[in-house]
Regions:
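Binuclear metal-dependent phosphoesterase catalytic core
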Residues: 2-9, 13-35, 39, 166, ...
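Active-site-proximal beta-strand elements of phosphoester/diester hydrolases
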Residues: 51-66, 174-188, 244-249, 313, ...
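Extended active-site neighborhood of metal-dependent phosphoesterases/phosphodiesterases
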Residues: 27-44, 106-241, 259, 265, ...
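Loop/turn elements at helix/coil->beta-strand transitions in domains of secreted/extracellular proteins
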Residues: 19-23, 50-53, 91-94, 127-132, ...
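Active-site neighborhood of phospho(di)ester-bond hydrolases with catalytic His/Asp-centered motifs
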Residues: 56-58, 94-100, 131-138, 180, ...
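N-terminal active-site segment of His-dependent metallophosphoesterases
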Residues: 1-114, 119
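Solvent-exposed loop/turn segments at secondary-structure junctions
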Residues: 60-63, 101-104, 138-142, 183-187, ...
């Protein structure tokens, strides 16, 4: 009876590998409780069909035409599976990409950028049928010394909803989002920074017009248009958290030790923004980017944004690690981890649920399979497959023994 099963052993091994590939691409997600969530009863976390569920990824670090064999047929293959399986299981309403789509975008010609865009669209798969928004990172457009209005405008024109300065503002399901080109906010006086300031002004005026009488905003508009390019602002009496959802690539400045804490799917403390960034850069697989992982927006820019926009919640990226931080004014900032094996062995993403019946936002941290685990699994399957082939064909085994 055992002999009759021997020829089927290799087939069983192959089927086991197929099942493993499907299972390993399933994300493991866990809700991360913010300070506002701790006071909410458990019933508040029940999903409502009218809630807005947004999947947020960052730091894809695509290589386009410069991708090698391993990149194309292993890492990209699994990243595509991660996107597809996440779409099937989580059923999000929208996708946000918080910068660094390209590993070397600021160094690429337009022809090579096109190959990155093709690779990006290939990865998205089913997400192309959903609303999606992309912001620009330092790897996409470069650092201050190399910022060019024409090149930034060209890159921004390839993504929906971005203006010439790389900023955007949109509303979906009555939730307002504002994305800023945070790279230009690191620089001195330049046209790109002026463009970002104009977006901040406009959104600040609209925020105040919603909260004040129709006659008062007209007077304030003329005052706010007199911009102080050293990031001065007019006093904003609107309470914190009343503004839009803010999307950035660089995190905002953090006071004190800047620590962030949460709990991942394994129950361990997550302090990945500052502490883990002190480890080796993590970008060795794709080179070092223009700015270090510890880089944040300056304190004056951070205060300017808080005063002008009063963001409901802030989502940022760049650090390659997950972080949930509460600023002194009560604003919550969530840093989205890198969703690629190019930046390290611990990829992931964030799912934010904007509830119809309350202001707080539910945030889930989703971890993905480690590259090292997948490689070990492939080696194990290869060894088992060879053994089953030898067992299934005793004559071949006898020949090898001679």
């Amino acid at each position: 009876m055992a002999v009759a099963w021997r020829p089927a052993l290799p087939l069983i091994t192959i089927l086991a590998l197929i099942v493993y590939e499907e299972r390993v691409s399933i994300p493991s997600c866990k809700i991360v409780l913010g300070a506002a969530d701790l006071s909410q009863p458990a019933t508040e976390f029940v999903e409502d069909p009218e809630d807005l569920k947004v999947m947020m990824v960052a730091n894809l670090l695509l290589l386009g035409s410069e991708a090698g064999f391993v990149e194309l047929y292993f890492r990209d293959y699994y990243m595509t599976k991660f996107f597809r399986k996440s779409f099937e299981i989580l059923n999000p309403d929208m996708l946000l990409v918080l910068g660094d789509i390209s590993a070397k975008g600021s160094e690429l010609t337009r022809a090579k950028w096109v190959s990155v865009l093709h690779q990006f669209h290939g990865l998205l798969g089913p997400f192309l049928g959903l609303p999606y928004h992309v912001i620009l990172g330092d790897r996409d457009i470069g650092q201050c010394s190399s910022l060019n209005v024409k090149s930034v405008n060209w890159v921004a024109s390839n993504f929906p909803g971005l203006d010439w300065a790389g900023c955007g503002a949109f509303e979906i399901s009555n939730i307002s989002f504002v994305s800023l080109n945070s790279v230009s906010l690191l620089c001195g006086i330049n046209n790109l920074r002026f463009g970002v300031e104009r977006v901040v002004e406009r959104e600040s005026v609209e925020l105040q017009m919603e909260a004040e009488d129709a006659t008062e905003p007209v007077n304030e508009y003329s005052e706010i248009r007199e911009i102080n390019h050293n990031f001065g602002w007019k006093a904003n009496t609107i309470s914190s958290g009343s503004g839009p959802v803010l999307l950035l690539h660089f995190p905002l400045h953090r006071t004190a030790d800047g620590s962030c804490s949460a709990v991942d799917s394994f129950g361990k403390s997550l302090k990945l923004s500052r502490e883990s960034s002190n480890a080796p850069d993590g970008r060795g697989l794709v080179g070092i980017g223009p700015y270090k992982l510890l880089h944040t927006l300056p304190p004056n820019v951070t205060e300017y944004i808080f005063q002008a926009l009063k963001p409901r919640i802030v989502f940022s990226a760049h650090t390659h690690g997950f972080c949930d931080h509460l600023h002194p004014d009560g604003t919550r900032e969530v840093t989205v981890p890198a969703m690629t094996w190019n930046s390290g062995d611990d990829p992931g993403f964030v799912v934010a649920t904007f509830h119809r019946n309350r202001k707080a936002v539910s945030v889930s941290y989703c971890s993905l399979a480690r590259e090292s685990h997948v490689i070990v699994a492939y080696i194990s399957f290869t060894v088992v497959f060879v053994l089953t082939m030898l067992i299934a064909k005793p004559p071949l085994l006898r020949c090898l023994r001679r």
